[in-house]
Amino acid sequence: MVRGKCMVCDSPNATNYHFGAQSCKACAAFFRRSIAMDQCYECLGDGVHSCKIDHTLRLNCRHCRLKKCQKAGMMRDLVQAKREIKSDKGKNSRNSSQSEDFFSPPPEQPGPSNYFDQFPWQASENEMDPYPSSPKIRKMSENLMGIDELQQFIQIPAGVDDFPDIFTDSDEIRSRMTSISEASAYVTGMEEEERLFGLAGLYTEQVINLNMRRRITYTDRLLGSVFDAPCVCPYDKADLKLFDHRTYRQKNRNDYTMILDYINRFPEFESLSKSEKTVLFRTAAAVDVLLDQSYYSQVIFPTEDVLVTANGEYLPMNPMPKVENQRDSGNFHSDEDYDRFKMLTSMKVRQWLHVCEPMKKLDMSLAEFSLFKALTIWHYNYYKLQCTGKQICSRQRDDIFRTLLLICDDEGHDSALIRASEIVLAVGIAMAEVHEMVTSYIEITVYDVLDDPILKDMLKFQY
């Protein structure tokens, strides 16, 4: 398959012309949604200069993305024509395979509480059709009134001759009601897509804000530089400092403030009790340590084996650092100095092998990573909260999973379900390493290798 460059977002995965312009499947789907729902977006920039539209940040400014679609040559009339053809097929042949694929409700899927108990499941052949694909749309037609039930509520006046013949033709009535039901399901499905894209935008924005604050805290950049572009990663290679076990602190008080700001905007966070908020906050702090360093390592060193910590330090992993039998190497001031080096470096090596390398192979986009991080936090806490908190966790992880399917399709993966499956399965990797990391830190504090009152307070929590 010949691939070109998308004229909208510069993605290298433009395989065809969509609505009159060479574009990737993601931008084509965005244009279709925007025109079909007659959406009007507000520019996130200054309103004078167009925002940058890049395939790594498609969710940033939808106003400028839509303008760029139209500038590239996409035509709204082609979207309308496509919808009319679908509607005609629905009228003339209820059994048309294309009509059913477009409008029919998806097969029943596991509910929010058992997504992860029954995952993965087998997808039907048509399940991943991206225009629109079944996993994106809830079963919209469940509550639509059936034709027989509807006829009980329709009272045709005695002077039926005064009405057009169309209302005396039951087949035509059935056909028109079918068309209305299908159109209703289509519009409702598009509205649900829009809600889920908004959720993806929220989590992505929170990660970008966290990155901006880290850039201010841990680099020598000018303050104005944080507004140059959305902060996909807080560091460049020039910003990094070599990992030093003597000065290394996993987090300081500013870091915990950043995490609190990050988690405060999670949907339904305010509905949790005080103790449940504390649990979610502690978990977010632990997950942030593991996942953000894996993402930074992937972005800054995509082809090199280098671990980048959340506070902007780097540790080469090829060859692996030697930690055993180094006490008499002459590089350490005391036994305590060596013990600190051994514990911290061993922990970083394990995190590299168990988390960073698997994450690097997944090569997640910013939107995928943002959803993955939030999903890990919510899912981890599902087993730790009370009944109401569990219900909130269940709703949020269900929403994130469906949003992840939508994003994987939007980014042009051949199989959104397989891609989302790979990302969701990595949640278990992160959860397992959280336990290992906490165990290492307990050893550090027990032996007074690291005197950190904030860390000791965090470790009172049973992860």
Swiss-Prot record:
Orphan nuclear receptor. One of its GO terms (cellular component) is nucleus. The lineage of its organism: Eukaryota, Metazoa, Ecdysozoa, Nematoda, Chromadorea. CDD domains: NR_DBD_HNF4A. This is Nuclear hormone receptor family member nhr-79. It comes from Caenorhabditis elegans. PROSITE patterns: NR_LBD, NUCLEAR_REC_DBD_1, NUCLEAR_REC_DBD_2. Signal peptide: none annotated. SUPFAM superfamilies: Glucocorticoid receptor-like (DNA-binding domain), Nuclear receptor ligand-binding domain. It is found in: Nucleus. One of its GO terms (molecular function) is RNA polymerase II cis-regulatory region sequence-specific DNA binding. The keyword Transport does not apply. Residues 83-119 are annotated as: Disordered. Transmembrane segments: none annotated. Its main location: nucleus. Residues 203-463 form the NR LBD domain. Belongs to the nuclear hormone receptor family. It comes from the Eukaryota.
